[in-house]
Regions:
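A glycine-rich (often HGG/GG-containing) alpha/beta subdomain
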Residues: 1-147, 151, 155, 331
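Short glycine-/small-residue-rich Rossmann-like dinucleotide-binding loops
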Residues: 242, 277-278, 302, 309, ...
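Switch I (G2) and immediately adjacent beta-strands of P-loop GTPase domains
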Residues: 55-65, 70-74, 254-282, 300
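Inter-motif core of Ras-like GTPase G domains
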Residues: 287-311
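Generic enzyme active-site microenvironment
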Residues: 273, 307, 333
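Short, Asp-centered acidic motifs that coordinate Mg2+ and/or phosphate
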Residues: 271, 303, 331
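C-terminal-of-GTPase-core extension/linker across diverse P-loop GTPases
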Residues: 2-13, 143-265, 282-284, 313-456
Length: 456
């Protein structure tokens, strides 16, 4: 299906080697012919074959304002499934904007955010989970996050979900025949086979759901709070992880009075770190407000790095902090490993996932902390090439499908009859079709594509 011809800049704004203006739609070759003049007069834009390129000049009102390359794609062998022309001009906002304006004057319409990928979805070039993976791939900061998104773009999730749908569809066909046509002498489903199929599907869905949190960390990053007493080494830790002097470090207790924020790439994980004010009793109103914010960040964080001064015995504030970390995704870092140790780590160990001796001034500690964070958040064991869920929409659909399959197993075990099992299997299939986008409403499609930028 060929839609209205649209145009937009497909590359990031600002100075660069090249900028790409993408045209897609029924008249994109005609529009391109009005703004692009091949250097070889014998070459005609309208006659260009797919997967070919022409060098030439970009014109606006017959005035050549840049030179570059036009790439041609014929429907359906293009990203959108429509005729597509990509015009590569020199980078820089002025040239790219003028080229887009020339395309609009020549008959194109401005593309809406995500409209190219939306057309790819509507034309069957991508499934909904693959379309969502495009945005994940664009936003990925680490290799593993990019690999997860690329696996989904390649259809890993869609294939896994379709395999479960095939199992349930075959099961439902037998159930429906037995329930709806009792006079046809349809053999009753073997209870053991029923339990085996439903159990296998539930196990696959459980695996996807379990891996969601680790996958989300790789794709989206996590907020991390650095907490501890004054002069324990919190700001030194932030500087170590950031790779430069982000926070002021002095021997004066209470130097950090407000929350200092810094994005850090730790291995394959993006951390949004918050270095907080030192936790202690104080009568200073400004410092007290900083401490209040420290506790608030601790409660909100998806990762807690609690720093303790290993050169001193545990204080009352240390023990209070440890207790506040109980049951949270928290790592205790006993700092100043380069000094004689006076800190009894066993007193705080029950409250943390792990306790690590470190020296926040040494680069080697960064690797130790990175490995510990990966273990705690589950990213160290995730297969970046495997199917994984992305976003609340997919997770919600997977949970509904898993719960419906569990309901079918309960109905079978409780002797409620195969008609009750059939209803649950139907619900599971509906949820899986929601996940893949086969049942997606216009509102859901809008929600997916509203995250996209113009030009993608």
């Amino acid at each position: 299906m060929q839609g209205t011809t649209i145009a937009a800049i497909a590359t990031p704004p600002g100075a660069g080697g090249i900028a790409v203006v993408r045209l897609s739609g029924a008249e994109c070759y005609a529009v391109a012919a009005r703004v692009f003049r091949p250097a070889n007069p014998a070459k005609k834009v309208e006659q260009a074959k797919g997967y070919t390129a022409l060098f030439g000049y970009f014109v606006d009102k017959e005035e050549a304002f840049d030179e570059g390359v036009a790439l041609f794609f014929r429907a359906p062998h293009s990203y959108t499934g429509e005729d597509v022309v990509e015009l590569s001009c020199h980078g820089g906002s002025a040239v790219a904007r003028r080229l887009v304006e020339a395309c609009l004057t020549a008959g194109a319409q401005p593309a809406a955010p995500g409209e190219y990928t939306r057309r790819a979805f509507l034309n069957g070039k991508l499934g909904l989970t693959q379309a969502e993976a495009v945005m994940d791939l664009i936003a990925a900061d680490g290799r593993q996050g990019a690999a997860l998104a690329n696996a989904a773009l390649g259809g890993a999730l869609a294939k896994k979900i379709n395999a479960q749908k095939a199992q349930l569809t075959a099961l439902q066909a037998h159930l429906a025949a037995w329930v709806d046509f009792p006079e046809e002498d349809v053999p009753e489903l073997d209870p053991a086979h029923l339990r085996t199929v439903l159990g296998a599907v539930r196990e696959e869905l459980d695996g996807l759901i379990r891996s969601y949190d680790a996958g989300a960390v790789l794709r989206e990053g996590v907020d991390g709070a650095i907490v501890g007493r004054p002069n324990a080494g919190k700001s030194t830790l932030l500087n170590l992880l950031a790779g430069f002097d982000r926070a002021i470090v002095t021997p004066v207790a209470g130097t950090t009075r407000d929350v200092v924020e810094q994005a850090v790439q730790l291995g394959d994980i993006r951390l949004n770190l918050f270095d907080t004010a030192g936790l202690r009793e104080t009568e200073d109103a400004i410092e007290a407000e900083g401490i209040r914010r420290s506790w608030k960040k601790l409660e909100e964080a998806g990762l807690i790095l609690a720093v303790f001064d290993g050169s001193e015995p545990p204080s009352r504030e240390d023990l209070a902090l440890a207790q506040r970390c109980a049951g949270r995704p928290a790592i205790a870092l006993v700092n100043k490993e380069d000094k004689p140790t006076r800190f009894d780590a066993e007193l705080i160990a029950p409250y943390f996932a792990m306790v690590l001796p470190v020296c926040c001034r040494e680069e080697g500690s960064r690797k130790v902390i990175a490995a510990a964070v990966a273990r705690l958040l589950g990213t160290g064991s995730i297969d970046p090439h495997a199917a994984s869920l992305s976003g609340q929409r997919q997770l919600s659909a997977a949970l509904r499908a898993r719960d419906a399959v569990a309901g079918a197993l309960d109905a079978a075990a409780g002797g409620f009859g195969l008609d009750a099992v059939s209803v649950c299997v139907d619900d599971a299939l509906d949820a899986l079709c929601d996940l893949t986008g086969e049942n997606a409403s216009e509102a859901v499609i809008e929600q997916v594509f509203e995250r996209f930028c113009v030009g993608k």
